[in-house]
Amino acid sequence: MSTENKQSLPAITLAAIGVVYGDIGTSPLYTLRECLSGQFGFGVERDAVFGFLSLIFWLLIFVVSIKYLTFVMRADNAGEGGILTLMSLAGRNTSARTTSMLVIMGLIGGSFFYGEVVITPAISVMSAIEGLEIVAPQLDTWIVPLSIIVLTLLFMIQKHGTAMVGKLFAPIMLTWFLILAGLGLRSIIANPEVLHALNPMWAVHFFLEYKTVSFIALGAVVLSITGVEALYADMGHFGKFPIRLAWFTVVLPSLTLNYFGQGALLLKNPEAIKNPFFLLAPDWALIPLLIIAALATVIASQAVISGVFSLTRQAVRLGYLSPMRIIHTSEMESGQIYIPFVNWMLYVAVVIVIVSFEHSSNLAAAYGIAVTGTMVLTSILSTTVARQNWHWNKYFVALILIAFLCVDIPLFTANLDKLLSGGWLPLSLGTVMFIVMTTWKSERFRLLRRMHEHGNSLEAMIASLEKSPPVRVPGTAVYMSRAINVIPFALMHNLKHNKVLHERVILLTLRTEDAPYVHNVRRVQIEQLSPTFWRVVASYGWRETPNVEEVFHRCGLEGLSCRMMETSFFMSHESLILGKRPWYLRLRGKLYLLLQRNALRAPDQFEIPPNRVIELGTQVEI
């Protein structure tokens, strides 16, 4: 059942406003200020103001309304979206070589998100707290400490979940967007001339007049669409129609009115460039506006944090990151999770960024490379889906791709100018995450191939054991097996060293499907291999967390009775050593060993009682 059917359309649309549009909805705090603050050599003059407003408006129309909401959101995997989902869809009907290239693109896009996610909470919260400079200039030195305090509280409450406070997100963000619209409309009424900037010719005129500098200035304009990936990534939570409805009825009109309201203010009072957003408000409204802005930026940060939790779980389940502890914070909503390691690593990174950059304007210089890089990759992957999966005409798809790249590539190229002034930060973080994900995936594959190269037949071994059985002991033994037709290492070593076997043996494989969820009817497949051997294959989607107790329950319904506290679980524990390698592969091998040592152990990963687990060690050279 789709999300839209579970709740009323107004309720789910309101919820989408509260979660999906937090990042892009707080962009008016700093976007126009960064465009006209003087770093590009523009004065606060009519042509520049009109040019930037026209660029911002048409970027919102083309990138958000047309590209993402109309085209990209057509590509879903059982209703789910996101860059890794797009990667999976794009690789379904392509050659092995093309699939490898698409996987690399998807991983780069996911890595870019990790780079961006460190900046979003910092720049959002700091931009709101900087409103203190207008209310009380003497509190300027408190901006960094207050930003850290706000974000510390936010990261501390993650372990308790956001179900309770999450109910407040939607009304707060709706209030925020109404305030954006109201402040902007008030200023536009005082200077309606600014509406001329709706004409796209002002954007064209801007490029013709300012030439090279106007191209570099695109690096600031792109701040208006940061968070656009959230529209696609959160599609599974809210559905396509509510997200589209929220955009066209509330978010887009509010953003447009506020940006144009800031422009109208600057045309009348160029000195307002120091903080045009807060100076839109009358003096009596500054403190309430500061409070609601702080709340809105916290909500925007929460959406990003939840997004990185979801992406991490997906990467873990698809085998691109090592297993780690994932805590469900809601019994009702499977999407509400908490990952302690990711939470505190992200917190430390955000605090370091705030202390290092000190002001949101400095952070704006680091923002944009990851966003626009992901946009380029999304264009390529989504058009691949259109051609390979939807079988659209190749010439039509080529035209769409060219149109998208004509916008994406200039935006990305313009942001490369920020490389030395802060753009290195998201690129560096993204590079680290890309290396980690590709290392874990490739080295894990190498390890499994090494472990399975003995080539013994499972069926032949079972037949031999039934014909000449070893000593049988009462009870049930479960051997965890990564591959279906391969003899588990733990079974081989148990027979080799202990020379005994339980009366009933279950070979259990937990498999991740290329889908977010697996229906309970398809959850468990049971096959009796011999009078005393059973094979159980349990399938899970990448948004689900495997649970052995649930598997046993499903087995009981299928006629294979299993009791957790009467079963022994045999698992292999590999002690890894590096073989001879070139120096660069040796470095990758050492990184894998580090990741392996810190990975969540299988008993904890599958929630198996520790006193029911027997681990058999083996040394493997990789």
UniProtKB/Swiss-Prot annotation:
User: Which cellular components does GO assign to this protein?
Assistant: plasma membrane
What residue stretch is flagged as signal peptide? none
Q: Which residues cross the membrane?
A: 9-29, 49-69, 103-123, 137-157, 165-185, 213-233, 247-267, 276-296, 337-357, 363-383, 396-416, 419-439
Q: Which domain of life is it from?
A: Bacteria
Q: What is its main location?
A: membrane
Enumerate the catalysed reactions: K(+)(in) + H(+)(in) = K(+)(out) + H(+)(out)
The keyword Transmembrane belongs to this UniProt entry's keyword annotation: yes
Q: Where in the cell is it found?
A: Cell inner membrane
Q: Which Pfam families match?
A: K_trans (PF02705), K_trans_C (PF22776)
Q: Which UniProt keywords apply?
A: Cell inner membrane, Cell membrane, Ion transport, Membrane, Potassium, Potassium transport, Symport, Transmembrane, Transmembrane helix, Transport
Question: Record's PANTHER family?
Answer: LOW AFFINITY POTASSIUM TRANSPORT SYSTEM PROTEIN KUP, OSMOTIC STRESS POTASSIUM TRANSPORTER
Q: Give the protein's recorded name.
A: Low affinity potassium transport system protein Kup
Q: Which organism is it from?
A: Escherichia fergusonii (strain ATCC 35469 / DSM 13698 / CCUG 18766 / IAM 14443 / JCM 21226 / LMG 7866 / NBRC 102419 / NCTC 12128 / CDC 0568-73)
